[in-house]
Amino acid sequence: MPRKQPAGCIFLLTFLGLSGLVGTVTRTYYIGIVEEYWNYVPQGKNVITGKSFTEDKLATLFLERGPNRIGSIYKKAVYRRFTDGTYSIEIPKPPWLGFLGPILRAEVGDVIVIHLKNFASRPYSLHPHGVFYNKDSEGALYPDGTSGRNKNDDMVPPGKNYTYVWPVREEYAPTPADANCLTWVYHSHIDAPKDICSGLIGPLLVCKEGILNRYSGTRNDVDREFVIMFTLVDENQSWYLNENIKHFCTNPDSVDKKDAVFQRSNKMHALNGYLFGNFPEPDMCVGESVSWHLFGMGNEIDIHSIYFYGNTFISRGHRTDVVNLFPATFLTTEMIAENPGKWMITCQVSDHLQAGMLGQYNVDNCKSDIFYPKMKGQQRRYFIAAEKILWDYAPQGYNKFSGLPLNASGSDSDLYFTQGDNRIGGKYWKVRYTEFVDATFTKRKRLSAEEAHLGILGPVIKAEVGDTLLVTFANKADKVYSILPHGVIYDKASDAAPNLDGFVKPGAHVKPGETFTYKWTVPESVSPTAGDPPCLTYLYFSAVDPIKDTSSGLVGPLLVCKKGVLNADGTQKGIDKEFYLLFTVFDENLSRYFDENIQKFIWHPFSIDKEDKEFVKSNRMHAVNGYMYGNQPGLNMCKRDRVSWHLIGLGTDTDMHGIVFQGNTIHLRGTHRDSLALFPHMATTAFMQPDHAGIFRVFCATMPHLSRGMGQIYEVSSCDNRDPSEQRYGMIRTFYIAAEEVEWDYAPNKNWEFEKQHVDARGERHGDIFMNRTENWIGSQYKKVVYREYTDGEFVEIKARPPREEHLELLGPMIHAEVGNTVLIIFKNKASRPYSISAQGVEEMDSGKQFQVPMTKPGEVKTYRWNIPKRSGPGPSDPNCIPWVYYSTVNFVKDTYSGLMGPLITCRKGVLNEKGRRSDVDYEFALLFLVFNENESWYLDDNIKKYLNKDPRDFKRTDDFEESNRMHAINGKIFGNLHGLIMNEDTMTNWYLLGIGSEVDIHTIHYHAESFLFKIDKSYREDVYDLFPGTFQTIELFADHPGTWLLHCHVSDHIHAGMETTYTVLRNIDNRIPYSTTSPGVASHPATVPSNERPGKEQLYFFGKNLGPTGAKAALVILFIIGLLLLITTVILSLRLCSAMKQTDYQQVQSCALPTDAL
């Protein structure tokens, strides 16, 4: 080798190493915002049924033009992708993407550059979820203290351009447990709800390293990928509503935009902008791997239960065929398509299904040599009939909680159980699945004592992986019915779905008097995953008319179990008790037997008005297995029994259920809880080993559901022969807490809305109704009652809240305890009416025999004791500390809305320091997201007297008045008035998110600029967390992005109603610590919070990091050295190349370790 050859190799190695250092992929997109007309039903018919829309009254409401109806075509603004900066050639997208913007893809380490041009007639922006951005690339308008160049991204005027730069940093990477590509979105964020309803939203996929092709950007790990947005597109919120009225209504001057029916006609229940099966069908082949990227957007009623007929999939390590989506919920599900045919994709929420939220997908036999696994397990036979029955929702005749008769005048149950001139009462004709012993259907199978609790539910169907189920169905009722199962595999011969797919499906319509045998298989591909419980809970139901059939009563539980889990008699090994609970509002107005029930039970049936609101309400039965107000039998167990609870949801968008187990906790995928959320067609399995004997409630914590009867009793007996020694408790932590009445201001500063300048359809600011005091609106100040901590039992001196607790605001003190501790609450009631203090998740002494803790009268002092057993602390998969809540239970609804609520944090042993604060994190924050309904407060009359100066008895309580009293608050503050969410850069924070409330309290909590981890069995990455009544969660957020950032609920109405604030991450430039859970003392709160622009100090953006002066200097030195090395390398390579060309007589190629030496 020539003498200089090693030097050349060294320089080339240096060059390639430096290239790798700075060689991140920049993925550049040219995006234009264009206005166009969008048709929600381009095929002009219901593709699922094949019928014309004129044959469907409800479809006509949405799709037919008229004097005051827009029809199916609307003007929208959409994102479109172009080839280059001339924006002259559009890059086509797959038809199934609908009006969504193009799919943007990147993997960890890449940089996304968006060149946006606004071709529309009004300003818009582009804001991403799931990636890093600086203030000049956030694309969101809100009061964040920035100006100048950091405001230019907030809105792009018509005809203008803007470039957004989003590095995909490691902190936003999918976790090992996440799918290879996480689903995110981008959307315009000037007025996000209106911008999105106008059409400006698209998918953004962030993948693990090595998943994307470096040049094409396509995935190399799956065969197919599809993106679907499920949302109720509210065209009433569109910026183009007036144009659409003028252009499409045949008599636009007759339109009343406030009319409820007109508004409903503009709410499009769509998949990517398509209704009633007009969604272009995604195609795939049997055996292919498919990634479904699903997300929701919208409002309080955007609760979606997405059901993929015919196949199952994995979602966050869990096997299922249904996932739930909410506004700004993003999911990646992974499917192996194994079942050929045309299958439906639907939202199983009744109202949404009826309004057209359904499409189809095709699984083709692309190869002739497809292998189908042979079922080697048992053949399990069931003989099930549909039988008409007279059902009693409360056979014991009284409210088991209050002891009152169900028809007691003025009681909560009176509306549902009083029979009369315009009321049916508590008995209805229904239809139920009943099990028989054989195919003759002459002898019913006797229910055992363990099955007494099933009520209206059909028999439990169970199978293990490898089994075949043969279900013979006899229709002994008087209507056409069927059986359709979740969670198993069936071919088209046993398909009971009602869609037209080219197959004759006799099992889809079994007439009265007929029988049909369904064959369902349980191959390995539908098995519970390693992280799933031994048996997955599903349901089966009649699908001839799935809304009417299930409202009539046809639903039952189905279990799919791992191999070897079931005993010979069908019970689960290692389980002592199994209970199956269906939580649903049975809407008897939708039953097939509604007219018959009117004729049978109403005293004057011909005078009834079926549209009367109170009559309609009286027929909505808030039941558990068809029982109300504690009338369900059979929920009995022994202390230390191993109990498996199988919980099922069904119904419509108000069927949002937060199921709470009083007195004991449940185990969910490695976590400890006492509650879980249920939605239509969702089912889950939870385990309990009760350690607390007594009589307890299992109930829905969604506030109206609780008062309307959706609660039952379960009893835990000591069974002394099975009672182990009691757990001993060590440290006693004592707190002096009082309930006291205060004047509370939800919005002392009203500048937030003025800065955002959001207006509604009438040109008024959205916040006016909540913040302004008029002759009919109370304004932002209310009398309330709150928990406050005192220094000692004299209750004279309130314990001052340190700066780290400033953010608690309305909430009571943050109580910390470790497993094995006892919490002693010395409680004084300084208010004017009785209250109490009770905590979820703990072992409350003196409870369990009277359903609620003792009340404390005004002026009294009472002691409450809470033990923290192991099951009240974090589970194996939980973070070190988990949240619960404490509140008053004298009247849970009114007490809570009046203000009595606080956080209880339970931790593993050794986590708390000597001051009772966490030693393992830098900051902790507790946030309660709740629409405080002041109409339900104990103090409403007081507030009317004081702030309106009117007599409450004479005051007319209009709809506007009641709306003005619904405060969409975070810790009791609205429109940016919650302060104290401050932390330093590069610190670990834990946030305790608390959900309480009613059907409107669906909250999707979005953190701008940061992502976080939440744990189920493993850790998962998100920047939005879904919160529901009765549910609580710890999220772990590493704060590494300095600035003031938006924190808000992503539900459209909640944004406009002020459920927003900001949090601030301070730079470490001065080593300032505003306050920290781990600091030795409590530092003073900083006088001012610095903005994202530091006056007089230049900043350098370097590989996704803002550098101060010292860092910038070091970076410049490094760049200079790299540049010098590259220059030297280039010169040497050039000289060597010239030398090589001149040496024509050189015969032999010398080699070193690099193939590039041939140059």
From Swiss-Prot:
PROSITE patterns: MULTICOPPER_OXIDASE1, MULTICOPPER_OXIDASE2
Signal sequence annotation: 1-24
Protein family according to the UniProt entry: Belongs to the multicopper oxidase family.
Glycosylation sites per record: N161, N236, N407, N589, N772, N935
Protein name: Ferroxidase HEPHL1
Cofactor binding note from Swiss-Prot or TrEMBL: Binds 6 Cu cations per monomer.
Chain sites annotated for binding Cu cation 2: H129, H187, H1050
Positions with a binding annotation for Cu cation 5: H657, C700, H705, M710
Cellular location(s): Membrane
Transmembrane residue ranges: 1115-1135
Keyword annotations of the record: Copper, Copper transport, Disease variant, Disulfide bond, Glycoprotein, Ion transport, Membrane, Metal-binding, Oxidoreductase, Repeat, Signal, Transmembrane, Transmembrane helix, Transport
Membrane topology: Single-pass type I membrane protein
Pfam families in the record: Cu-oxidase_2, Cu-oxidase_3
Sequence ranges on the Extracellular membrane side: 25-1114
GO biological process: copper ion transport; intracellular iron ion homeostasis
CDD domains in UniProt: CuRO_1_ceruloplasmin (cd04222), CuRO_2_ceruloplasmin (cd11021), CuRO_3_ceruloplasmin (cd04224), CuRO_4_ceruloplasmin (cd11022)
Catalysed reactions listed for this entry: 4 Fe(2+) + O2 + 4 H(+) = 4 Fe(3+) + 2 H2O
UniProt-listed Enzyme Commission number(s): 1.16.3.1
Residues that, per the record, bind Cu cation 4: H304, C347, H352
Gene Ontology molecular functions: copper ion binding; ferroxidase activity
Residues that, per the record, bind Cu cation 3: H189, H1008, H1048
Cofactor(s) required, per the database record: Cu cation
Entry function: Is a copper-binding glycoprotein with ferroxidase activity. It oxidizes Fe(2+) to Fe(3+) without releasing radical oxygen species. May be involved in the regulation of intracellular iron content.
One GO cellular component term noted in the UniProt record for this chain: plasma membrane
Taxonomic lineage: Eukaryota, Metazoa, Chordata, Craniata, Vertebrata
